[in-house]
Amino acid sequence: MALPWELEEDILSRLPPISLVRFRTVSKHWNSLFNDKTFINNHLSRSRPEFIILTNSKIYSVDIIDHNNIDPTIRLHEIPTYDIHSRGTDLNRTIINTCDEFLFYNYRYWDNMTALWNPWLRQVRWIEYANQEFCVFGLGYDNSRPEKVYKILGHLFCHGKVLRDQKVVIYECASDSLRFIDRPEDDDWPITETAKRSNVSLNGNLYWFGCSNYENDEYYIRIFDFSTEDFKPFCLLPCQMSHSTDELVLAVYKGDRFSLLKQCSVTREIGVWVTKERISNDNGNGGEGVEWLKLMTLSKPNLPKLFGTVSYFIYGKTLYMCNGDDETALACIYIVREDVCKKFQIGSGNINCRHCVYTPNLLSLPLFIG
């Protein structure tokens, strides 16, 4: 007896993409779901964040098993590399983060290697720009338009000029063209290497930490608005650094808000704040236009000392982090809540890696048609 089609769809929408892709050939009906926007959105709403980890030779996804269980664990999947690794394996030059539901891969400016990537659909779209002196910062789009026309923010590297004097550039993906825009008038230029690795994309805009006073470590959130193509302060942080070696990490929370993680470098205590309202172009005015709520404080004695690039997400009342081990520098997944602090090492030996948080989905890559 065949199940009703609506029930089949509901069951399939709860499966991870790695399983769904295998079922495409079962029937024409099932295969058609990959082009059904309602099904794709239902599936995305039920997907949970994972970690994507790039090493010099392999790419992994790390899924959390039994989120709400008393003893959560992880599941490691090796992802086919396609031609990602064939173009470059020096991870010191590699940046990976997300723009909406896509992975954004960049292998620095001198190698002309930038791509959007959906590993579950086995899709990679390389963005080719003729000028190899283009140093990429991040990807976004004008959110005032009904369709998403993607753009890349960066600067042209001009030999013989100091970084402060580099020209700010927008690369138009649809027309394959570069054009200059005005440089920020304040001192927050050039964008630091740390900001390039840790910027956050939300609603088509890029966000990162700016500093109004480096002597006193006074940080705030800056935005590059792709609709107006300008740099500006977005909002103040709910906390400041107590020590110059404290860690501050910005992330997307529940798809439309921000979370902020702070770790004290002395006590290793971790605090997490989240924004009360969803983030939009209008609720940040450079000051106190965004309201933050303290979500959790974690002060276990075996908390790791976070350093370098930190990826994290919050699910329920649990904090999930990817970072190097503070003794061996090996990539590790940490699961932390009031009653749990677990560490899982990824691989063995001296593994250099890049990582980010990513929600698996069935969204096809854009064609970059304006």
Curated annotation (Swiss-Prot):
Record's protein name: Protein SUPPRESSOR OF NIM1 1
GO process annotations (BP): defense response; protein ubiquitination; response to bacterium; response to fungus
Keywords per UniProt: Plant defense
Documented effect of changing residue 257 to Q: In son1-1; confers resistance to pathogens such as P.syringae and P.parasitica
A GO cellular-component term linked to this record: SCF ubiquitin ligase complex
Gene3D superfamilies: 1.20.1280.50
PROSITE patterns assigned to the protein according to its UniProt record, in alphabetical order: FBOX (PS50181)
All residue ranges annotated as the F-box domain in the record: 1-43
Tissues and organs where the protein is expressed, per its UniProt entry: Ubiquitous, at low levels.
Disulfide topology: none
Function summary: Negatively regulates a plant defense signaling pathway which is independent of salicylic acid (SA) and systemic acquired resistance (SAR). Confers sensitivity to P.syringae and P.parasitica.
